[in-house]
Swiss-Prot record:
GO MF assignments: 6-phosphofructokinase activity; AMP binding; ATP binding; fructose-6-phosphate binding; identical protein binding; metal ion binding; monosaccharide binding
Active site positions: 127 (proton acceptor)
GO annotation terms (biological process): canonical glycolysis; fructose 1,6-bisphosphate metabolic process; fructose 6-phosphate metabolic process
Name of this protein: ATP-dependent 6-phosphofructokinase
GO cellular component, one term: 6-phosphofructokinase complex
Quaternary structure and interacting proteins, as annotated: Homotetramer.
Its EC number(s): 2.7.1.11
Known cofactor(s): Mg(2+)
Enzyme class, spelled out: transferase
Length: 337
């Protein structure tokens, strides 16, 4: 394989630029040419494809977002869109692609593979909801950004004796909420994977203020449960009388310079993706498991999902058998007593 392309797709995540940089520089070191594609699958279909060299990625490792831009392109789910994209790739002499993104991006890569066009996926999403990897690019940065924000909200919450509901991204997964909640010492964490009793949540707030002498109460809420405003309304209906505020951290979690960890795993996975294409291997997704590189079929990775669930004993079971987690939900309950 002499010429490959790389592009991000779907929602952006800190560290995508580091992955693109790694793909470009590794490929060049292996004697391959690299092309970039702007705006993901939309740019592929439109022919927004151009050469990338070491110079073009020279100052990108520390930047958040993605300099190749990104977009969602639902039309690629249709055969017409897929064939149009492949036609453009062949027109530019490209023999394989590296796709950086989440499950929607993986589905596109899966379609390319089914049409006999080698594609390798790299997990790039702050949600950390991709099967076949312990961590996705952008997750660590998003968690650190959330923790920094929650720490600051705790300051003002303590000053006024308030309850704060902090809504964080994550789509249908509670990973960001769990990690950020534990790291920030949240009083309660609400995630899609675990049922909750709104009356118990409300009574816990009251007990903390009246009997434990607390001057604040922080609830971290995953967006996959419901919106922060809707949750606050339910709290009031359940009898909460505290001075309640809602903060939605929103897209701020997608921005900012990536952490060292995100830069390293992005570089590691990007380099390995090139090695796979050089060997003529497509239809694979790169991941990290137990701090080692792993590969899994992109078909299974895109279809399986990586959401975790809880047993009656509170033990977290991850649907991806290659992924292990601490019992974070139970851990937080014990630490917030």
């Amino acid at each position: 394989m002499k010429r490959i392309a790389v592009f991000p797709s779907g929602g952006d995540a800190p560290g995508m630029n580091a992955a693109i940089r790694a793909v470009v520089r590794k490929a060049i070191s292996e004697g391959m040419e690299v092309y970039g594609i702007n705006r993901g699958y939309a740019g592929m279909v439109d022919g927004d494809i151009f050469p990338l060299g070491s110079k073009e990625v020279g100052d990108k490792i520390s930047r958040g977002g993605t300099f190749l831009y990104s977009a969602r392109y639902p039309e690629f789910a249709q055969l017409e869109g897929q064939l149009a994209g492949i036609e453009q790739l062949k027109k530019h002499g490209i023999e394989g692609v590296v796709v950086i993104g989440g499950d929607g991006s993986y589905h596109g890569a899966m379609r390319l593979t089914e049409h006999g066009f080698p594609a390798v996926g790299i997990p790039g999403t702050i949600d950390n909801d991709i099967a076949g990897t312990d961590y996705t690019i952008g997750f660590d940065t998003a968690v650190n950004t959330a923790v920094e924000a929650i720490d600051k909200l705790r300051d003002t919450s303590s000053s006024h004796g308030r309850t704060f509901v902090v809504e964080v991204m994550g789509r249908n997964a509670g990973d960001i909420a769990l990690w950020a909640g534990i790291a920030s010492g949240a009083d309660q964490i609400i995630v899609p994977e675990e049922e909750f009793d709104i009356e118990k949540v409300a009574s816990t707030i009251q007990y903390d203020f009246e009997h434990k002498g607390k001057n604040h109460h922080i609830i971290v809420l995953a967006e996959g449960v419901m919106s922060g405003e809707a949750f606050a309304q339910k709290l009031k209906e359940a009898g909460d009388k505290s001075d309640l505020r809602v903060t939605n951290l929103g897209h701020i979690l997608r921005g900012g310079s990536p952490t060292a960890r995100d830069r390293v795993i992005a570089s590691w996975m990007g380099s390995h993706a090139v090695e796979l294409l050089k060997e003529g291997k497509g239809g694979l997704a790169v991941g990290i498991h137990n701090e080692e590189l792993v590969e899994s079929p992109i078909l299974g990775t895109a279809e399986e999902g990586a959401l975790f669930s809880l047993t009656e004993e509170g033990k977290i079971i991850v649907n991806n058998p290659h992924k292990a987690r601490l019992d974070f939900a139970a851990l937080n309950r014990s630490l917030s007593q």
